[in-house]
């Protein structure tokens, strides 16, 4: 019998990545999406044709859900239960995920990143209390550290509406896990920066690798960035999604910090990307103050010791240089009009 997993945020990087992972394990995956003029069911399903061919017992379904509306959440969960009888695992990955944009619509960030968690957990308490739930929190909760690394016991200091919304969502997880009248199996993961070829070009790492590829092909003349005085702890998203799944396989729910524990400054990102194409980045990178984020978080580094001990998390399964190279290679092939394959990092 297939395990049944519901994943919110069908267009997002982690939702696509986790769907690949779960289909490879023979899951029945139900992706939720918000009905709008930009949604293309065929465009979503095309990513998973090979997974479904390789795993004939796996299934993929789509379900409408507006996570910012409680009635829509309830209708979605009840519809899934009616059609598929149960929900074994729920992954709350949908979010208003661009930190800079969250300053322009603070209320939406709180609604989608925080209150949506309440909507789902309250619905599960009343309709599917045995469902195990994972919520994607964020390293932006940290607010940055001048030195050292962040673990599960450190204090939060959210500096953006995005992070404040995620903080609210995480508190709802703790409340419903520990509440006498619910006692749900629910947890959150604080995944530090992670990316793969599904990362949007609105994010720094993909903007850097994609623009470097375009410059190498003569399709762009420069890369505009706000600045490079920031440091992040970057891992490949496939490994982070595996950690999400492992959290829900534990006997008791627990929150985890996930990351490589390595510091990489902005200059390292551009240096590695442009070096892949044998280009001097200083000739092409321009700085524009209008691209700087308000309340910029300078340094975000993880201490994943708990994940190592309890989830079998392995730090630095691929090097930072390999990470950047894989994205650069993919972007070069993509911008060359080829049909590049998604890297199978588990085989590296």
Please give the residue ranges for each predicted region.
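N-terminal Rossmann-like NAD(P)+-binding domain of SDR-like oxidoreductases, especially those catalyzing
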Residues: 1-194, 330-331, 344-348
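Generic structural signal for alpha-helix termini and adjacent loop/cap motifs
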Residues: 83, 105, 123, 127, ...
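Non-catalytic, hydrophobic alpha-helical segments
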Residues: 240-244, 258, 269, 307, ...
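Residue-level signal for the nucleotide or nucleotide-sugar donor/cofactor binding architecture
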Residues: 68, 104, 112, 160, ...
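C-terminal "lid/loop" region of Rossmann-like NAD(P)-dependent oxidoreductases
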Residues: 223, 227, 254-256, 264-271, ...
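C-terminal amphipathic/interface module of NAD(P)-dependent oxidoreductases
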Residues: 299-348
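NAD(P)-dependent short-chain dehydrogenase/reductase
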Residues: 147-149, 161, 171-248, 262-263, ...
């Amino acid at each position: 019998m297939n395990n049944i997993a519901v994943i919110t945020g069908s267009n997002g990087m982690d939702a696509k990545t986790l769907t690949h992972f779960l289909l490879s394990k023979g899951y029945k995956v139900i992706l939720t999406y918000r009905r709008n003029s930009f949604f293309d069911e065929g465009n979503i399903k095309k990513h998973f044709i090979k997974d479904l061919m390789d795993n004939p017992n796996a299934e993929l379904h789509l379900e409408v859900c507006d996570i910012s509306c409680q009635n829509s959440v309830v209708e979605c969960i009840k519809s899934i239960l009616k059609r598929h009888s149960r929900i074994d695992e729920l992954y709350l990955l949908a979010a208003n995920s661009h930190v800079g944009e969250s300053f322009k619509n603070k209320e939406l960030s709180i609604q989608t990143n925080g209150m949506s968690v309440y909507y789902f957990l309250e619905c599960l308490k009343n309709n599917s209390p045995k469902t195990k739930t994972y919520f994607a929190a964020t390293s932006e909760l940290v607010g940055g550290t001048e030195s050292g690394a962040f673990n599960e016991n450190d204090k939060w200091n959210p500096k953006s509406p995005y992070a404040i919304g995620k903080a609210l969502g995480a508190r709802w997880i703790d409340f419903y896990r520990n509440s006498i009248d619910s006692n749900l199996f629910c947890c959150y993961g604080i995944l530090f920066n992670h990316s793969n070829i599904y990362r949007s070009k609105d994010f720094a790492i993909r903007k850097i690798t994609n623009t470097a590829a375009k410059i190498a092909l003569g399709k762009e003349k420069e890369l505009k960035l706000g600045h490079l005085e920031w440091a992040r702890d970057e891992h490949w998203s496939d490994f982070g999604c595996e950690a999400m799944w492992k959290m829900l396989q534990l006997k008791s729910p627990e929150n985890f910090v996930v990351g490589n524990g390595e510091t990489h400054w902005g200059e390292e990102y551009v240096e590695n990307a442009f070096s892949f194409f044998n280009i001097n980045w200083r000739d092409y990178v321009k700085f524009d103050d209008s691209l700087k984020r308000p309340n910029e978080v300078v340094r975000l580094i993880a201490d994943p010791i708990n994940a190592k001990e309890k989830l079998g998390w392995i730090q630095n399964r691929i090097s930072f240089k390999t990470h950047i190279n894989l994205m650069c290679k993919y972007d070069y092939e993509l911008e060359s009009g080829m049909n590049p394959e998604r890297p199978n990092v588990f085989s590296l």
